Amino acid sequence: MNEELQNQFMALDVYNQQVDKLKEELSNIDMMIMELIRSIESMESMKVSKEILLPLGAGAFVKAEAQNPEKIILSVGVDVLLEKDVDEVIVDFQKSVKELEETKELVNTQIQKTNQEIVKLRSELEKRAAAIEQRNAQMRPKTN
């Protein structure tokens, strides 16, 4: 196999790895979006009822009552907490969801472009493989 052909096979492998990484990134974005939406829903429901589920860990929760549901405490860094108005946090989270949706579109576009390159490269490789096969067939001695 000549060097150019090997390089094309390596490029095909790299493209496939890129698509896998981009799909993984999409999955992470989806999880972040879902977490933000759940948080928004929880904050919205606190406006109706102060009752919340307090996570204890390992999937265990206890029912509790929020003392001040109008204020949300956010972790904004290592050991740094910030208190904000619940409506402000909801708007911030909705903005984050929108930004993540836009990022998701960009990632999907990149996946499509990479897949197009994969299709183009595979087609090229198939043509070259067919040409090599034909050349090899012509070089074989004919037997009667």
UniProtKB/Swiss-Prot annotation:
Organism placement in taxonomy: Archaea, Methanobacteriati, Methanobacteriota, Methanomada group, Methanococci
Molecular function (Gene Ontology), one example: unfolded protein binding
Swiss-Prot/TrEMBL keywords: Chaperone, Cytoplasm
Protein known as: Prefoldin subunit alpha
One family name in Pfam for this protein: Prefoldin
Function as written in the Swiss-Prot or TrEMBL entry: Molecular chaperone capable of stabilizing a range of proteins. Seems to fulfill an ATP-independent, HSP70-like function in archaeal de novo protein folding.
Assembly: Heterohexamer of two alpha and four beta subunits.
Gene: pfdA
Species name: Methanococcus maripaludis (strain C7 / ATCC BAA-1331)
Subcellular location: Cytoplasm
